[in-house]
């Protein structure tokens, strides 16, 4: 027989239990709380949707908190195989004579490398590495947002860059992130907020390009919910429960 406890009280207790361990199994939670597996899974789903926990195989853990953005150099060494596969899928979605936006990041840099031989595209970016690569190696037309420079990220941030984006219309924006979960995209850098929010307003289609290692992380500032996106391109390491919830949001999901 289940213990009588309202959902909010039970979820608070569940959070306290999870916070004391790096990972706790569903079976342990069932025994401690004295409720059914279904009840525990329902509570975990609610907490995951609220951006507080992440489901793992047979259990649950707290989200990993991202206190600062990794540098461009650090990110360039991570998940290289996944980024290449993601970028190849992204390029398949770019129609001829499109205006596209490449957000600052190493996954979007891989997209830039994939489109270098195309002369029918206008590429807008706030990333200096992407702009330089395309300037030297590509046939694309290129525009840079300008604005305050984030040296470690090698990109422009802040209101000036955002104001540039207010004056354009983009067919597809490829958006990057270092932390996301079922609640949405987050950032530890307040100066990135204006650019991130501007591009999603002035693009006809918004596509998140991210490898699964960034899922289950959270930072201080919420940028926007996943439901604001049209498409997510990720690798096959994305947890199955996350795949199911994304489908329920009517967000297109490609796993490569």
Curated annotation (Swiss-Prot):
Keywords on record: DNA-binding, Transcription, Transcription regulation
GO biological process: regulation of DNA-templated transcription
DNA-binding region(s), chain positions: 24-43
Record-level Gene Ontology MF annotations: cis-regulatory region sequence-specific DNA binding; ligand-modulated transcription factor activity
UniProt-listed InterPro entries: Carb_Metab_HTH_regulators (IPR050313), DeoR-like_C (IPR014036), DeoR_HTH (IPR001034), NagB/RpiA_transferase-like (IPR037171), Tscrpt_reg_HTH_DeoR_CS (IPR018356), WH-like_DNA-bd_sf (IPR036388), WH_DNA-bd_sf (IPR036390)
Domain HTH deoR-type as annotated: residue spans: 7-62
Source taxon at top rank: Bacteria
Transcription regulation found in the keyword field: yes
Presence of the UniProt keyword Zinc in the record: no
Entry-linked PANTHER family: HTH-TYPE TRANSCRIPTIONAL REGULATOR SRLR-RELATED, REGULATORY PROTEIN, DEOR FAMILY
The protein, known as: Uncharacterized HTH-type transcriptional regulator HI_1009
Source organism per UniProt: Haemophilus influenzae (strain ATCC 51907 / DSM 11121 / KW20 / Rd)
Lineage per the UniProt record: Bacteria, Pseudomonadati, Pseudomonadota, Gammaproteobacteria, Pasteurellales
């Amino acid at each position: 027989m289940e213990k009588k406890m309202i959902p909010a009280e039970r979820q608070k207790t569940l959070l306290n239990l999870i916070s004391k361990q790096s990972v706790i199994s569903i079976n342990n939670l069932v025994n401690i709380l004295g409720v059914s597996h279904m009840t525990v899974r329902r509570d975990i789903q609610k907490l995951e949707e609220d951006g507080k926990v992440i489901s793992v195989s047979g259990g649950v853990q707290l989200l990993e908190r991202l206190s600062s953005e990794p540098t461009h150099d650090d990110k360039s060494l991570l998940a290289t195989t996944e980024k290449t596969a993601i970028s190849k899928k992204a390029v398949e979605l770019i129609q001829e004579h499109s205006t596209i936006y490449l957000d600052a990041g190493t996954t979007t840099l891989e997209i830039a490398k994939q489109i270098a031989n195309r002369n029918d595209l206008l590429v807008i970016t706030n990333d200096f590495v992407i702009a330089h690569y395309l300037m030297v190696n590509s046939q694309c037309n290129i525009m840079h947002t300008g604005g305050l420079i984030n040296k470690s990220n090698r990109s422009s941030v802040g209101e000036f860059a955002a104001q540039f984006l207010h004056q354009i219309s983009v067919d597809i924006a490829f958006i990057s992130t270092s932390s996301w979960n079922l609640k949405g995209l987050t950032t530890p850098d307040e100066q990135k907020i204006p650019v991130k929010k501007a591009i999603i307003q002035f693009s006809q289609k918004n596509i998140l390009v991210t490898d699964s290692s960034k899922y289950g992380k959270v930072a201080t500032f919420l940028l926007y919910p996943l439901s604001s996106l049209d498409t997510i391109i990720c690798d096959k390491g994305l947890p199955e429960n996350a795949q199911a919830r994304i489908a329920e949001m009517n967000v297109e999901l490609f796993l490569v």
